[in-house]
Amino acid sequence: MATSAVQSAACPPNTFTCADGSCIPSDWKGDGEKDCEDGSDEEAVTGETTTKFDEVVSAPTTPGSDEDCDWGMQQRIDNCSEPIVHFLSQIERLNLKNMSFLTSSEIQSRFEAGCNLMTTYQECVGNQKGCMPDEGVHSWGEVEVFMCQLVLPSVKEHAGCFKSSADPRCDASKTSSSSTLCGLVTSIQTATSCLETIRPETCSSDAIEMLSPIREETEHIVSAIRCVTPEQHASSTTLIVDETTESTSASAEDDDDDVLTTNTSEESTATTAHDEEVENKPALNINMADAVNSLYYIYDICSANYSADPFAAIADKICAKQDEIAKWSNCYQKTLEKEKCAIRNATSKCEALISYNNNLDCAIVTMNDECEVDAQNLVVELQEEVNDLIIAGKCFEDKKEEEKEPVNDGDFHLQSTLPKCTEEQENGALGCLVELVEINKKLTAFANLNFLLEIASPNSTVVEGICSLFARYEQCLSATVFKNSQRCSFASPLNSLARIGLAPICSLDSRPLLSKHRDCFEKLATEADEDTNCQSSLSTLSNTVQMMLQGVHGEALLCKSFYTIRDTFTCGERAVKNKCEADALTDLLSLKTKMTSLGEEEGCPRDPPANLDEIISRPVARPTPVTMPPRAPTAKPLPIPSAPTPPVASSKCSIEDQKKFEECVKPLTSFQPHPLSVIAIPRDIDQACEAFHTFKACSAESNCHPLWARGMSAMFEYACNEANEQFKKVRKCIRETSMIEEVRSCVSDFSRGAPTAACMSSNRLHSCAIPQIQGKCGQDAADWVSNYIIRFANAIDVRCKVGRQLPVGRVVGIGCSAEEESIIEHCAAPLNDIGSRVEELFAGGMQSLIKNINSLAPVFAGACNLTDEFKTCAHFLLEGRTSCVVSSCMVEAGRGICQLSDPAKAIDDNLSCLFGQAQEPKFAQCIRSTISTLKQFNLSTLRAVLPKFIDCTRDIVVAKCGESPIKIMKAMSTPDICPIRPHQAPIVPINQPARVTPTLETVLSSSTMVSTSSESDSESAPEQETEPTVPSTTETTESPSTPTDGCGESGLVEYLQCETHLDQFAFRPISIIGDASKWDQFCQMANQTYIPCVEGLKCKYEPAASAQIGLIDSICNRKITLKDQKQHGMCLSEYTKSDAGVACISDFGKIDQLDSSSPAQMCDGINQVMRCSTSEIEKRCGFDAVLHVFSIHMHWANLFNASCILESPEPTKDSTSIDVNEVEPSRDQKPVVVTKDETTPVSITTAMNNDITESETTQSPPVQSSVSFHIILAALIPFFALF
């Protein structure tokens, strides 16, 4: 048998070198056939030891344990592995589904490039022991000799024969999907088997002889690299043969057969070998209940015998994708370090599937932050396959809770015969309880009515009202909880009580059943005595429900209510037995039996426990916090309410439109708009309104409609039209009030808010200024200003709620989407019910409040129990991943109190002590001057005066009661929104930013000086403070100093020495650094070396020093920006090294960033770079990369020059943008696409970043504006200025 030789200076290991220098597999030597052309492989060779090919490919890959591996050697191995890993990554990109290795010369040439990689690798690592090579290296080591020394030479020599593998009679679909290498090897195995069978004319006898060795070696390779073969009959290969085809095989002599089956000669042997192979595998020692851990140790699992493990079905799924899963090991490692998900072991297949799925669902939350999009998508695909297994196995239908021994902890526990509800069902049921909010009031009516008579009366309004509410509740459960009509046992006893107490009497057949005996029941009602007054005990149900809402012994109270209702039936049973017909007693017993069966089904014992009353009377202890970490909201949202989509500013605004808009708005801004008094001089309101109408007509056809202009227009629309006359009555007082220092501070805070944060900024302004205006100017003025602010906020975001629009006592969302509002409404339903009852406690005047103060404690205690459920349900929103702010002053009032063992007692003690000081003369005087002045006494009006009341009584209360009552009342009385923070989150005042970058006054003043002052004037401005400061109330402006002339030569040398740290990374525009693979090293160097070096300089070159630090900080220390930079970095880096990229950035390198003209030069230079490179970057890297580059360069340009404008990039018509931040479906969230406000003044947008507390939970980098108007900024200063 002849083989074409592959010439080389030295043959690879495990091969035999023929005398003529050609290479053949080592096990061909001495096999009785001359495979070398000179026959040297069959000549006796003394002193030479060879190794069989099958021994090579099956050699162990782990010669030692991890403990024997030196760290330095492992690093060396990893470095030596890089060429092979890179080669395999290129192979993974090949499309082997539509192209065959045996017929495609392109694919063959790709594999030839890797033929010497193992030799190079072995020379690189030398004689290492105990270290684990990369799994890809192991796989290629098994495949290389087979491919390069056997398959490739044979395919080239007999190309015509192997191309016949494309024959339609050969089934090419039977390949492994484990990995590209597995798919390749199994496709060769299938093709050679087929060619051996059909023996096409294009195959010579030499070619036919080559097929069998190749096929046999593929079997070894498939086993060695742990390929998962497709499910097919192991004993035969089926081929579809054309009737006209002549076969040279002896088995094809029968022309009548359409199907030719070639039986494997060693069927039983192969089966036995497979079983032995499975049995010989080591036992599975990886805990697959930890989903991410199983992905990290994928090869260990797939090489183990997991057939008897409950997780075997999952192991089959992940092992089918083992190489693809293994590529993202870094992702799994990072996730394991941070995720804290509950791990539940399993004893059955269904338990394993559900446990794995739940654990993976929890881990995905962390993976979204730590892993690449491709890794996330892979996990989502895997989760979908597990879901398919759950559905196919009917795990949800067959799932039954294992019988548990009763917990002997002294408490009362239900023993329901129903399966436990899932977390999603529990959350859905909590939402349905909203339908029963009014049921408690209706139940109290039974105390004055005859229970049986009302049920038997078809026209009973009480029963009809109760059953109407219950019908809506049941309809909600059917639609959102019991979709498969399978009931479950609720953890919330209120749901169970509703079913026990209401289902029997509200069923369609119950009332007609008793209505037949109404005459008898009516007679019983008129003759009722103490023994037959059965409904009297039902009066306690209202109080029982009240206690259950507070979370007090819910399970025990449920059964107590069940026994009360049953006793009522028993009482009626005795009366009916004595005075009614036998049919009436039978029908009543039928109804009682139905109710009893429901109670026992929900878990109540048939006989009441002897200590039931004692359990209910016990003090309530604060439950231990749940150890299971919060998960993304799994509650099914209620139907999304119809809400108008908030306006989005148009991004298409040409230079001509910008100039036209400047001219239109200039006359209006000359009146100096003000957020409270409309304009700086309110008496000129008529002239200002004329200018506003002119502005409207002028800008009607303009494409430039920035958000701030919309808000300003809404304010003027209100002040100049419908509320003009009212404004003229209160304008003087509003103007005077706006001069007060506290109000001026409010306006300053508002000025730092961007239009995109209008809702939050407007709420702060409203809560801060309205009380002052109300006190100084009266309610009419306060109402006018409140409407004025609301118009501004709603013009920018129609969903925004400000001031009185915020419902009292409810959990609300600020700046939330319709989907987020739906989640809040759903998760907060029980809390909102309690909040509505808090409002009732504050009605009726001060005496009523003091009387009801005892009822406030249990209400708050109930809220404490429900707060944790709410935070778990809405955890995703509370993490700060979106701009949605969840607010509840009631929840914040309970912060700290709810952590005590007895929250009700703590609140009761503190508030009772506070109002117990009413006998103190000074305390009484404080009440008369604040609370007693209220005409309408409710929680909303009380909040307006409580701050003054607290300040007045503080000394007395602290001396007698301590600080706690003050803290509770402050939280309840705050006029601001009360953001709910997740568990253990630090408390940061929402209206006090933790870090302030250059203030609005600085930015505005710099723009003003550009248009109104000389350059020399601006240079004389005082140096800007570097610490966070309260905006000055004077007209003095600030600008950063630029000591470019006073540093001297030594200062320049020190600065340039710091810059050398950047030079080693080839610092440049567009890609920022030359090698995109070194971002981690660059950021480490910048934070540890470069930034401290520059900040330590005695003399800094500004603005170059600050701009350089600001640019690096905005990338390296913002996780999302750094992630995007790494995502696009390789492509951007390659572009900057291309001829086109070099041409675009060459002129930028000529800019002297230390020169006094650098701000203007940098602005022009960055603009030129962006104009030159945008289209090419879009072609190479996509429009997402363009937007990323634009964002960081806009920030860089503004750090040099606050008034710099970059031309906004526009996508080409045929561009396609790939969303690299796609979130998996299980998260229920899609990425928020932020449309940049192209005409927003840069000062406002920069101010937005100042106003928001920067923390680790920030999920998106600050949005930089792309357009700024110098003249508009100069004219708008009075709009935000302090008076």
UniProtKB/Swiss-Prot annotation:
LDL-receptor class A domain residues are 10-46
**Does this entry carry the keyword ATP-binding?**
no
The annotated regions of Pro residues compositional bias extend over 626-647
Gene Ontology CC annotation, any one: membrane
Intrachain S-S bonds: C11-C23, C18-C36
Q: Where is the composition biased (Acidic residues)?
A: 34-45, 1016-1026
Q: Low complexity composition bias: which ranges?
A: 261-272, 1005-1015, 1027-1044
Q: Which SUPFAM superfamilies match?
A: LDL receptor-like module
Question: Keyword annotations for this protein?
Answer: Coiled coil, Disulfide bond, Glycoprotein, Membrane, Transmembrane, Transmembrane helix
Q: Where in the cell is it found?
A: Membrane
Protein name (record): Uncharacterized protein F44E2.4
Could you tell me which species this protein originates from? Caenorhabditis elegans
